[in-house]
């Protein structure tokens, strides 16, 4: 993976298919060595800044544990721990941190912010999530798919993403499908489809890799024959309550339940979710949603599906660690 040394990791379309497949192989190898307890530390003495303008569980833990496993040191800068965009520009922050750290992770708002960090830092910058893209999540998703369907290569797999497909997950799934040749179906109301320009761009790339990208409102047609069903939350914290009502009303027919899994015609279909999920009423927000919108069986996914043998969401969550570690090792060391 020496070709990725000192590279940024901002969005998947910055890479070619061989580079993405190389990262997945590296992640699988790093996972195996960690499980055996004989992991080689490639990042001893490296210092890494973790900027979180949005709260996180999986992303923060994955970056921190990956760094510690590899012998690196981290500094966590939370929403109140830096002056980015308030008293200091992103450009100036990048130039300061680039003098002190070997790499910078950014999880926050607009993609232009992480792009600006990368432009000015002089060290590798990794996108932990922006409003537009979530590339580290997709690496974990692809590794999970390979592990749970080893008899197929990625370009032989079919994935249906059901629900709100115009978010950062929908965008990044498009890019992933184009690069690795997935048969991707985005199953959603037309008003929840992604930006047509991005769809066109990804379809152009998919022509070279054998990928197929379909957008449809037809749930039965969209999930037929799928190897994986994927969904994400319908609403986000901070959105107005009026938006919640509109979104839930619009997307209720697209809930992932057992009937939808059965509609795939594939008894071995697996369920993916990037988490957190509103699958029950065991959280304060889940209770509020259940009472207000009569969603006692779950929102975007039912508890029955989430807790079933179809669900591989916790393997998926664990793989955040191994794939993020692969990005760190590939961009900060020259080992093959």
Curated annotation (Swiss-Prot):
SUPFAM superfamilies per the UniProt record, alphabetical: Aspartate/ornithine carbamoyltransferase
Top EC class for this record: transferase
An annotated Gene Ontology molecular function: ornithine carbamoyltransferase activity
Pathway involvement of the protein, from the record: Amino-acid biosynthesis; L-arginine biosynthesis; L-arginine from L-ornithine and carbamoyl phosphate: step 1/3
Location within or outside the cell: Cytoplasm
EC number: 2.1.3.3
Cross-referenced InterPro entries: Asp/Orn_carbamoyltranf_P-bd, Asp/Orn_carbamoylTrfase, Asp/Orn_carbamoylTrfase_sf, Asp_carbamoyltransf_Asp/Orn-bd, Orn/put_carbamltrans, OTCase_ArgI
Pfam families recorded: OTCace, OTCace_N
Residues noted as binding carbamoyl phosphate in the record, renumbered to the chain: 56-59, 83, 107, 134-137, 274-275, 320
Coiled-coil residue windows: none
Entry GO CC: cytoplasm
Keyword Cytoplasm: yes
Catalysed reactions, semicolon-separated: carbamoyl phosphate + L-ornithine = L-citrulline + phosphate + H(+)
Keywords, ordered alphabetically: Amino-acid biosynthesis, Arginine biosynthesis, Cytoplasm, Transferase
Top-rank taxon, per record: Bacteria
Binding site for L-ornithine: 168, 232, 236-237
GO annotation terms (biological process): arginine biosynthetic process via ornithine; citrulline biosynthetic process; L-arginine biosynthetic process
Protein purpose: Reversibly catalyzes the transfer of the carbamoyl group from carbamoyl phosphate (CP) to the N(epsilon) atom of ornithine (ORN) to produce L-citrulline.
Family per record: Belongs to the aspartate/ornithine carbamoyltransferase superfamily. OTCase family.
PANTHER family in UniProt: ORNITHINE CARBAMOYLTRANSFERASE SUBUNIT F-RELATED, ORNITHINE CARBAMOYLTRANSFERASE, MITOCHONDRIAL
Protein name: Ornithine carbamoyltransferase
Originating organism: Erwinia tasmaniensis (strain DSM 17950 / CFBP 7177 / CIP 109463 / NCPPB 4357 / Et1/99)
């Amino acid at each position: 993976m020496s070709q990725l040394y000192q590279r940024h990791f901002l969005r998947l379309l910055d890479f070619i298919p061989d580079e993405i497949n190389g990262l997945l192989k590296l992640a699988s190898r790093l996972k195996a060595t960690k499980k055996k307890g004989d992991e080689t530390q490639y990042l001893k003495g490296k210092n890494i800044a973790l900027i979180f303008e949005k709260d996180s569980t999986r992303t923060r833990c994955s970056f921190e544990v990956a760094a510690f496993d590899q012998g690196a040191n981290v500094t966590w800068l939370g929403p109140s721990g830096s002056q980015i965009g308030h008293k200091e520009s992103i450009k100036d922050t990048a130039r300061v941190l680039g003098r002190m750290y070997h790499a910078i992770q950014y999880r926050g708002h607009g993609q232009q912010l992480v792009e600006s960090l990368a432009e000015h830092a002089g060290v590798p910058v990794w996108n932990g999530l922006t409003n537009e893209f979530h590339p580290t999540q997709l690496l974990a998703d692809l590794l999970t798919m390979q592990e749970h369907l080893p008899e197929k290569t990625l370009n032989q797999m079919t994935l249906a993403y059901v629900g709100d497909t115009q978010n950062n997950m929908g965008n990044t799934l498009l890019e992933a499908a184009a690069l690795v040749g997935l048969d991707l179906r985005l199953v959603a109301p037309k008003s929840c489809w992604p930006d047509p320009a991005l769809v066109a761009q990804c379809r152009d790339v998919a022509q070279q890799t054998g990928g197929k990208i379909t957008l449809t409102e037809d749930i039965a047609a969209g999930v037929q024959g799928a190897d994986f069903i994927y969904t994400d939350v319908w609403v986000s914290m901070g959105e107005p309550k009026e938006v919640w009502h509109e979104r839930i009303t619009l997307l209720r027919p697209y809930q992932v339940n057992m009937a939808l899994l059965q509609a795939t015609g594939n008894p071995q279909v697996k369920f993916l979710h990037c988490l957190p999920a509103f699958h029950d009423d065991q959280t304060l927000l889940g209770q509020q949603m259940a009472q207000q919108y009569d969603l006692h069986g779950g929102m975007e996914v039912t508890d029955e599906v989430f807790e079933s043998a179809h669900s591989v969401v916790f393997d998926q969550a664990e793989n955040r660690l191994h794939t993020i570690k692969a990005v760190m090792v590939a961009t900060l060391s020259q080992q093959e």
